[in-house]
C-alpha cells in the first residue's frame, strides 16, 4: 500500500476519517512477549515525585523513569496517536511511545485523588490545563506562570505513598495505593 492509498478516505466514511496505522518500526520498545505474561510493580512517590520502583529508591527521578520505561516497554505499553491543535492553528497528528510517563501520570493521579480535597483537585486540573496551554504557546516567561507553579507545587506536599500497577501486553492497570495522607482513611 503506497502513501497516497493510505491517505485516501475509506469507502462509506467521511473524508475526515483516516485509518493510518504506524509502522512497527516506529516503536522502539516493540519486543517479543509472552501473550499471557503479567508483572505487578509498585511506584513510590514523595511530595509528588517518583522516587522508587518496587521499594528500590533511585538517585534521581530520571533514573526511575528510565527503569520504568524499560520494564513497561517490554510489554509494548504506552503507544498512542495524539491529534491536537498546533500553535499556528492547524491540526497535527503524532504517534508516540511513552510507557513510563503514561503509567506515572495515571498512578500519580490516583494518589492525588486520595490525598487532595475536591477543591484542590478541581483547581489543580484547571490551572494545570492553562499552564500547559501557555507553555505550548511559548509563554513560559509570562508572570502568571510563576503563580501557577507556586499553587501546583503547594498541592504536592501530601502526594506521598505507594501505587500498585499491573503490567500486561499493550496495557496496564492501576490496582491500588497506600498513603499515610489518604483522606479516605481519616
Q: What does each of the following model-derived ranges do?
A:
Residues 1-186:
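Nucleotide-activated chemistry modules centered on ATP-dependent adenylation/adenylyltransferase
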Amino acid at each position: 500500500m503506497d502513501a497516497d492509498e493510505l491517505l485516501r478516505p475509506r469507502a462509506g466514511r467521511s473524508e475526515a476519517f483516516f485509518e493510518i496505522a504506524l509502522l512497527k518500526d516506529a516503536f522502539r520498545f516493540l519486543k517479543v512477549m509472552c501473550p499471557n505474561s503479567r508483572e505487578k510493580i509498585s511506584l513510590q512517590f514523595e511530595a509528588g515525585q517518583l522516587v522508587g520502583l518496587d521499594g528500590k529508591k533511585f538517585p534521581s527521578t530520571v533514573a526511575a523513569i528510565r527503569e520504568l520505561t524499560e520494564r513497561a516497554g517490554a510489554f509494548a505499553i504506552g503507544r498512542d496517536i495524539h491529534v491536537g491543535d498546533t500553535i499556528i492553528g492547524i491540526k497535527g497528528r503524532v504517534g508516540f511511545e511513552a510507557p513510563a510517563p503514561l503509567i506515572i501520570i495515571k498512578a500519580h493521579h490516583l494518589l492525588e485523588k486520595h490525598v487532595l480535597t475536591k477543591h484542590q483537585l478541581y483547581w489543580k486540573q484547571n490551572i494545570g490545563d492553562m499552564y500547559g496551554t501557555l507553555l505550548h504557546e511559548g509563554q513560559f516567561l509570562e508572570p502568571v506562570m510563576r503563580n501557577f507553579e507556586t499553587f501546583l507545587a503547594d498541592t504536592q506536599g501530601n502526594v506521598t505513598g505507594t501505587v500498585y500497577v499491573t503490567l500486561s501486553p499493550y496495557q496496564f492497570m492501576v490496582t491500588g495505593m497506600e498513603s499515610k495522607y489518604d483522606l479516605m482513611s481519616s
